[in-house]
Curated annotation (Swiss-Prot):
Domain of life: Bacteria
Lineage: Bacteria, Pseudomonadati, Spirochaetota, Spirochaetia, Spirochaetales
Annotated phenotype, changing residue 335 to F: Loss of activity
GO terms for cellular component: cytoplasm; nucleoid
GO biological process terms, semicolon-separated: DNA recombination
Principal subcellular localisation of the protein: cytoplasm
UniProt subcellular location: Cytoplasm, Nucleoid
Note on how the cofactor is bound: No cofactors were found to be necessary.
GO MF, one annotated term: DNA binding
Protein name from the UniProt record: Telomere resolvase ResT
Alphabetically ordered keywords of this record: Cytoplasm, DNA recombination, DNA-binding, Endonuclease, Hydrolase, Nuclease, Plasmid
Function of the protein: Catalyzes the conservative, sequence-specific DNA breakage and reunion reaction that generates two hairpin telomeres from a replicated telomere substrate. Breaks two phosphodiester bonds in a single DNA duplex and joins each end with the opposite DNA strand to form covalently closed hairpin telomeres. In vitro relaxed-circular, open-circular and linearized plasmids, but not supercoiled DNA, are all substrates. Cleavage is position-dependent relative to conserved sequence elements.
Additional record remark: This strain of B.burgdorferi has at least 12 linear replicons with covalently closed hairpin ends.
Listed Pfam families: ResT-TelK_cat
């Protein structure tokens, strides 16, 4: 049985058994103490269905027995609020002040709930349990509880603040610097992420990008699209020339050969190679634990500053620009933790210089798009000013690789240097300095180090 079907069936059994218990209690067939005991057994039997993953931290949350009982108690509390709310609703378009006050009562506030029971003369009544049962009519009740959890998480985001040191103009200059790099495709990837604020896997593989106008790009196919999300595409503002961005995306996909990679492998590559370089380059500029996914959050903040209409609320802007449903504001609150601490007008040239230095320190190999034709290779072999014996041997190895694959043009993609080293070792029985190979390839493929 598929896991989703099994969980749905388990939910249904749980709901029915819970309803049987409360109906017995309402009909005086069970005492309150007996009810509590039965609830404990029920929670024990069904706690497995309450295992789930925290969407905010991606860590597994185990709702154990005590937590399961706590959920049940909180829903009893919620049923008290629900009954009073229904009793005080007179017209569908008008809500009394009392109902507005009920909205501010937490379902965990047992003291307040007891006050409500007393003030509404519900002490000796069991009828409010019927409202509790109503909350369990479908498995939606767990989603409702997850919503309460989500609100608590949003409130925690309000308290947590992470300050971003750079200003808007520095941000734009960083994007220009990264997009125009020819040393490593990872640098262009960071520039694209900062310029458009999309998910890494959308840039790498999943989505299609088109120029909307000189300041906007249209994206089709949204990753992590929820079933009820009717948004299939999104148009958003960008911090660089749309044509340059789209060409960079094509180059990234070509260099990484992502059409042959699964989403899982792409994520694995991001976690290691891409995140490591990102943290090296932006050390002490962004928080040390940040990764390439941080680019999405910082885009949201700076795009609001640069592009949002006057008086538009920030959470609404973030939701809109990311292509989320209007009522799905959790991500917006998550990104709102980041506070732009520097509102100066001028770009920080010293920081840009530092980034340039770090790029030349940490990026020691060529990994952007270049090509070599067989004609150029033949001319290089015939040239008289040969650097050394290893250089000419490298040219011969490359020629043999092209002949083996029947290629007239060889592209300098990521991993080619490793392929050349393996072929060199197989042919000549030894290898030479890796940095020297990088120097040779810059001459052969005609690019600057």
């Amino acid at each position: 049985m598929p896991p989703k079907v099994k969980i749905k069936n388990d939910f249904e059994i749980f709901r029915k058994e819970l309803e049987i218990l409360y109906k017995k209690y309402l009909n005086n067939e069970l005492s309150y103490l007996k009810l509590k005991e039965k609830l404990k057994i029920l929670a024990e039997n069904h706690k497995a269905i309450l295992f789930r993953k925290d969407k905010f931290t991606n860590r597994s949350i185990i709702l154990n027995l005590s937590k399961t009982r706590k959920i049940i108690k909180e829903y009893i509390n919620l049923s008290v609020i629900e009954r009073i709310r229904r009793d005080n609703t007179f017209l569908f378009f008008w809500k009394s002040r009392r109902i507005k006050e009920l909205k501010n009562i937490g379902i965990k506030d047992r003291k307040k709930i007891e006050e409500l029971i007393f003030s509404n003369q519900m002490n000796d009544e069991k009828s409010y349990f019927q409202y509790f049962i109503d909350l369990f009519v479908t498995p939606k009740w767990l989603n409702d509880y997850a919503h309460k959890y989500k609100i608590e998480k949003i409130n925690s985001y309000r308290k947590e603040q992470i300050f971003v040191k750079i200003n808007l103009n520095t941000y734009i200059e960083i994007i220009k610097l990264l997009l125009n790099q020819s040393r490593d495709i990872r640098l262009k990837f960071y520039g694209v992420l900062m310029a458009i604020g999309r998910r890494p896997v959308e840039v790498m593989k999943l989505s299609q990008f088109y120029i909307a106008d000189k300041n906007h790009i249209r994206m089709e196919f949204i990753a992590k699209k929820r079933e009820n999300n009717i948004v299939n595409e999104v148009v958003f503002p960008v911090f660089a020339d749309p044509e340059l961005i789209i060409n960079s995306i094509k180059e990234i996909r070509y260099m990484e050969q992502t059409e042959n990679l699964t989403k899982e492998i792409i994520s694995s590559n991001l976690a290691y190679s891409y995140n490591r370089l990102f943290r090296q380059i932006f050390n002490n500029i962004f928080a040390p634990e940040e990764s390439v996914y941080f680019c999405r959050a910082i885009y949201c903040k700076f795009s609001y500053l640069a592009f949002a209409p006057k008086n538009m609320e920030m959470n609404y802007w973030i939701t809109k620009v990311l292509g989320h449903e209007p009522n799905d504001i959790t991500t917006a609150f998550h990104y709102n933790r980041y506070v732009l601490d520097n509102l100066d007008d001028k770009a920080d040239n010293s920081l840009l210089t530092l980034l340039n230095q770090r790029i030349y320190t940490y990026v020691r190999r060529k990994a952007t798009y270049s090509t070599l034709t067989m004609d150029r290779l033949e001319s290089l072999i015939k040239e008289h000013h040969i650097f050394d014996d290893n250089y000419i041997k490298t040219l011969i190895v490359i020629k043999n690789l092209m002949l083996k694959d029947n290629l007239e043009t060889l592209a300098m993609v990521r991993g080619l240097n490793v392929k050349i080293r393996k072929a060199f070792k197989a042919t000549y029985g030894y290898n030479y300095n890796y940095i020297k190979l990088t120097e040779y390839l810059s001459i052969i493929f005609n690019y600057k180090l």
